[in-house]
Design a protein with these regions (language model features):
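Generic alpha-helical propensity signal that fires on short helical segments
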Residues: 47-50, 82-84, 133-139, 156-158
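Extracellular/virion structural assembly segments
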Residues: 49-115, 145-154
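Viral virion structural and adsorption modules
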Residues: 1-4, 139, 143-159
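Short beta-strand and beta-hairpin "edge-sheet" elements
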Residues: 32, 98-146
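Solvent-exposed edge beta-strands and adjacent loop segments
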Residues: 1-70, 117-132
Length: 159
């Protein structure tokens, strides 16, 4: 058995354009949680004492906290969306979640998921004498399952 640590899961983001992708490691993220936020329906028939709950979908969300570090492309992308109060598709980003503990046969290749999410940065804060941070969430999207090569920064969907 092997403990899986937070650093065993890498988060990459495409901070480029559709014409020129630029996939970068989220290097200044200090906290991130993956929440499924299941959507459920509940039903009870007259012959039942208890209701039945069915999961009908998910509202994926990743609450995030990042240090403000000039030169980190992921931070600069997220901060620009916050600072300029972007809306709509200008908030979308491709997010790659790479399981570094699940290597594939090809060198530097691991099981991974890709999800297009909305960047929702809600706060920019900091106390006197401390480094500033931004906080918010990455919201929505459906997962595409595949592999990710950390050397070439290429995602390959499963067939």
């Amino acid at each position: 058995m092997q403990d899986i640590m937070v650093y065993d899961e890498a988060h990459y983001f495409d901070v480029g354009t559709s014409e020129t992708p630029d996939i970068e490691l989220g290097g200044v993220i200090t906290e991130m949680t993956e929440s499924t936020n299941p959507k459920e329906t509940e039903k009870q028939y007259i012959h039942q004492k208890s209701s039945i709950t069915k999961t009908t979908g998910y509202a994926n969300e990743f609450p995030i906290t990042m240090d403000m570090v000039k030169g980190d492309k992921v931070f600069e992308n997220f901060y620009k969306k916050f600072y300029e109060r972007k809306t709509g598709n200008d908030l979308n980003i491709d997010h790659y979640i790479v399981n570094l503990w699940e290597s594939e046969t090809e060198a530097n290749t691991y099981k991974a998921r890709k999800i297009t999410q909305t960047v929702s940065i809600t706060e920019c804060n900091g106390a006197a004498g401390e480094q500033k941070q931004i906080t918010g969430s990455l919201k929505g999207g459906d997962f595409v399952y595949g592999t990710f090569n950390t050397s070439t920064k290429t995602f390959t969907p499963n067939v």
